[in-house]
Amino acid sequence: MKENKKSVSTRRASSHCKASKEKKEDFMMLPTVDFCFKELMQNDNIRKNIIAALLNVPPREVENTELMPTILRKESKDDKYGILDVRVRLKDGEQIDFEMQVEAFDCWANRSVYYLSKMYAGEIKEGEGYDCLKKCIHVSILAYDHFLDDKECY
């Protein structure tokens, strides 16, 4: 049986579509992509296990991980605006800021301290004592070596 050009062409196109579909099904977004990281951290179980690993405690001890707003609001017109990747409050009131950074950023340490200070300062209200302030933790997940000579950062 002799095939005509049209049937060969159709079969090739069909084969190409199948290969293209398989590539799409094999696609996996890396967790270093901001969107993917934020979506993963929406999962309570994943979030608790990451926090447990970072704090070096069993996951069952991480009882509550409330996601908080990530926008660091401006107090005045001239203030710097900030947006955290993922902000979590633990049961005891401590906060953790998770930041994913793929591209090297010269002022990363300064930015991290700025974010932490805004989180910390935002915890105390008028009339409260300073003893009510809770710990704020910053976690930088970097796809590059920021502290080349520092063996403590890993």
Over which residues does each language-model region extend?
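Elongated, amphipathic alpha-helical interaction scaffolds
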Residues: 1-154
